[in-house]
Amino acid sequence: MSVVLGDALGPRGRRRATVASVAATAVLLAFVALALQRLSAKGQLDAAKWSILVKPQVIRFLLGGLVNTLRAAGVAMIPAMVVGTVLALGRISFNVLARLLAGAYVQFFRSVPLFVLIIFMYYGLPKLGVDLSPYWAVVAGLSVYNAAIFGEIFRAGILSLDRGQTEAALSVGLQRWQAMRLVVLPQAYRRMIPTILSQSVTLLKDTSLGVAVTYEELLRRGQIAGEFGKNPLQAYVAVALVYLVVNMALSRVARRLEVRQRRRYQAGSISVAGAEETVAVAVGASIGGGGA
């Protein structure tokens, strides 16, 4: 059943929409032209200002920042997903204390700005006797914050599965934790892959907050290059383009996976029969592991 949010536009409405689109485009182009004119008047479009960005040493310097960005994001992903899984299980647990603790963690760390967490990790923890380098301060902040986000993503994935998945697993003799580990979690992870990748893109962009603690990720390296060459605008444009390319690539992968997942579900690949087959495989693996 589809929901119609508004009537279809008639000929007059379509003409008005076309005129509005053309007018908005014209205004945007005018702003762009004005900005370029101002930049040109101040010499910001001179070739000499941009030529420094193609120098090998500058390129290597910026690529080093990109490596640092990817390294911090990749390392932070691991504890974030592990703790996120624990939080998801805690949120759906029959144990009241586990639900309360997991819920409190999620609510607290989703409410605190990530910038504040990174600042606390670098400047606050030393007051408690824990000294972290800029790199580990960024990783720690990203990890504790994104654990709460991934916890909600995984919980949504678990709750989106048919209850028959767990019931079928329990009916053939698996313990509840075995059913969750062998049957439910693998399917929940697969179902939420597009969302996981989308959050990974956000995590990658959030590494730029490391500039506040002098971590030399891509943005910080761009800032240094701009100050050294006295062309900060050009350096920031180069950094923005690198972020754009990386994030567009990850977003494209996420969209493709989302389309593939949607087609699988529409084709009925996830069904009760599929659940029974999954449980049978899981039980076989469990028995085989126990025999070994």
Region annotations inferred by a language model:
Residues 1-292:
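Transmembrane alpha-helices and adjacent helix-loop boundaries
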